[in-house]
């Protein structure tokens, strides 16, 4: 398979590494030249995408960036061969995902609504969770890339939108967990509980959560990058 990952940030870089590790020819694209150079040094490809590309994961920030990558002045969809698939991994509104699916279909390109979860470490391990929805053809075309980047792929429907709806549910809970964790940490500090001890104890108790275990160490260390 010939694949590309557009967006080599904390999540996209790990996805690109995982796809490359699965012995697929993999192109990395990013406005950050250092990220691209690092990927090339690890065996990846850069430069113009091949005309016979099979799959593209778009791992950017939001709907506006996704649309720009797909249909902007340098948009990739009109250049993709018929039967190729776009895996759209950003968190976007469900209606936007449905619109992108229809626009891709008009070019003979499959669109898989494929928001991701798991964090940078799991992206690098090829162990993400993907909340996916799309046609059977989109799933089939995306399978080699999904197999490389994820250990859990939820099939949530036969059209785009359902995956993004589920991601919105996940993000609501994630936001609540982060806010509650911050309030709990602050409360503990007012009671004389050291932040380091808060993290040590609560991580092993019923009040823990994935977001606490993933984000609280950064907060306690004062590292917000």
Where are these regions (language model features)?
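Rossmann-fold NAD(P) dinucleotide-binding segment
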Residues: 49-111
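Helical "substrate-binding/catalytic lid" subdomain
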Residues: 162-225
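NAD(P)+-binding Rossmann beta1-loop-alpha1 motif at the extreme N-terminus of oxidoreductases
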Residues: 1-58, 84
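Hydrophobic beta-strand scaffold residues
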Residues: 26, 46, 110-112, 153, ...
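Rossmann-fold dinucleotide-binding core
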Residues: 3, 91-171, 175
């Amino acid at each position: 398979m010939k694949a590309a990952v557009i967006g080599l940030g904390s999540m996209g870089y790990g996805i690109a590494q995982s796809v490359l590790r699965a012995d697929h020819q993999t192109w990395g694209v990013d406005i950050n030249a250092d990220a691209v150079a690092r990927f090339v040094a690890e065996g990846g490809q850069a430069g113009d995408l091949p005309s016979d590309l099979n799959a593209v994961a778009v791992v950017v920030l939001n709907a506006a960036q996704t649309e720009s990558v797909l249909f902007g002045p340098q948009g990739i969809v009109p250049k993709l061969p018929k039967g190729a698939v776009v895996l759209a991994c950003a968190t976007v509104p469900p209606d936007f995902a449905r619109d992108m699916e229809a626009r891709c279909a008009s070019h003979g390109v499959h669109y898989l609504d494929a928001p991701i979860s798991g964090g940078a470490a799991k992206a690098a391990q090829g162990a993400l969770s993907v909340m996916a929805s799309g046609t059977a053809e989109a799933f089939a075309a995306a399978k080699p890339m999904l197999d490389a980047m994820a250990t859990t792929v939820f099939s949530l429907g036969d059209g785009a939108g359902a995956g993004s709806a589920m991601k919105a549910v996940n993000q609501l809970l994630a936001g609540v967990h982060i806010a509650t964790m911050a309030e709990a940490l602050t409360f503990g500090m007012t009671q004389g509980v050291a932040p380091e001890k808060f993290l040590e104890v609560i991580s092993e108790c019923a009040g823990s959560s994935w977001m606490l275990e993933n984000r609280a160490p950064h907060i306690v260390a004062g590292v917000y990058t």
